[in-house]
Amino acid sequence: DCMIALTSPRVQALLSQHNISLDSMLCKNVPEEVSVGVVNGKVTLSSASQTAAGQVLVVNGKLMITPDAAEVLQKYACILVNGMIYCPQCLSAVVSARCILNGKLAVYPDDAVLLPGSSIKLDNTFLLRAQSRLYWNEHRFLAVDSRLDTAALAAKGCSFSAPKAILCASLAP
């Protein structure tokens, strides 16, 4: 029993000559001399990432993909992820075609600043470092501090993207 079995045509021929039962969630054919990289935790793929063509990448955790990573993604023979993939909208089709995912795919706007965490609190401390950017969180933004200077936040040109936003009544338009 195994989660993932990497085989080659030669290995499959050898297995078929014997009474062997392979119980796996996924059986993937790869070239005979393929290099396999395993990451337990978090890895980021960007244009600066170095990889040999035809490599297999196994990620147990989080795979963060930046909008400039298209060429790097094409170099991998296969990417297997047990966990989470964070992917920009512009690469979602490539990621769907090149990656095998046992978990969740979170697609974010290409130009967004990713803010990690289960929720992002918008307060005057956030306002101090805010820029004219689109901020994204996979869960929610919280604007529940009635002292938040929403006019100053709007003047900075901030915008937000998340499935949910929770606002206190005094901040609602």
Feature locations, PLM:
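N-terminal, charged amphipathic alpha-helical interaction modules
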Residues: L142, F160, A165-I166
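Charged, amphipathic alpha-helical stretches
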Residues: M3-A5
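Short, T/G/N/S-enriched strand-turn elements that build extracellular solenoid repeat scaffolds
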Residues: P9-S21, M25-V36, K42-V56, I65-I79, ...
